[in-house]
Amino acid sequence: MKRVIACIDSSPCINALADAAAWIAKQTGRELVLLQVLDYYPASYHLGEISGVIGFESNAMLLKELAELEQKQSEIALDYSNNLLQHISERILAEHGIQTTHIQEKGDFLEQSFQILQPDDIAVIGLLGERSAEKNKPIGTNVENFIRGANCTVMTVGEQFKPPTRFIFAYEYSPTCIKMMKRIAESDLLRLLQCHLLYIGDHAEILNEPLQYLNQAGLDVVPQYRYGDVAENILTYQQELRIQLIVLGAFSHSKIHQFFLGSIATTIFRNSKVPLLVAK
């Protein structure tokens, strides 16, 4: 059975993330899986930094104390994870009528997540993580790395979520975007929503083929042509029409590189007030 993987922690995005994952599960009939990765650092993490400046005897005593502390720390972290999973599960069941399954892992969030994700999953991640929220960062440290490294479609969610009725599909003529167009036409998640097919560039005729294809597939499509900066146009169009979801297929190689590593990603992630769906 295909899955929605909700990557949960105690960030301010958690309730919106749960609602978004539940919406996807309802739209697609997928299993809803809550993924919680315990990536805390043990008490002995910095021991190597001080071992060279203390004597052997005191170091041995410190190791014993740290071992006892780490055991307690591990138990507390596991209790925290169990309570968080239970709370979110109960909330999703009460508000959306969906039973969830759980995956708990320990270690680095990105490493553990990438081992779990499958190509046909849809992963949902909050724009803010626990540490980012504490430091008042606009984007979680793991978000861009997660999108870049995940082998499946990823939705990013902020602190609010409303079930979308319309979405923007930012299109450029490329093999990957053509593949994405076909996936949208077949998608249980997107095909019932109004598609705003947005092209930013100097060749408006590029939209003729995807417009015809999506219309023939039964989608309600609104074509739109813009010129200028990619990120600025996507954000402006979304705000003008109050569209609730931005779907980003892949652009050509140079634009993918710029999107994930450059100013386009930063601008969109920091300024978008609606979820982003990045399709692989």
Report residues per predicted region.
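Small/aliphatic-rich secondary-structure junction motif
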Residues: 2-66, 162-225
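Structural alpha-helical scaffold elements that stabilize or flank donor/cofactor-binding regions
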Residues: 115-117, 146, 160, 239, ...
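Active-site glycine-rich loop that binds ribose-phosphate moieties when present
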Residues: 136-157, 176-185
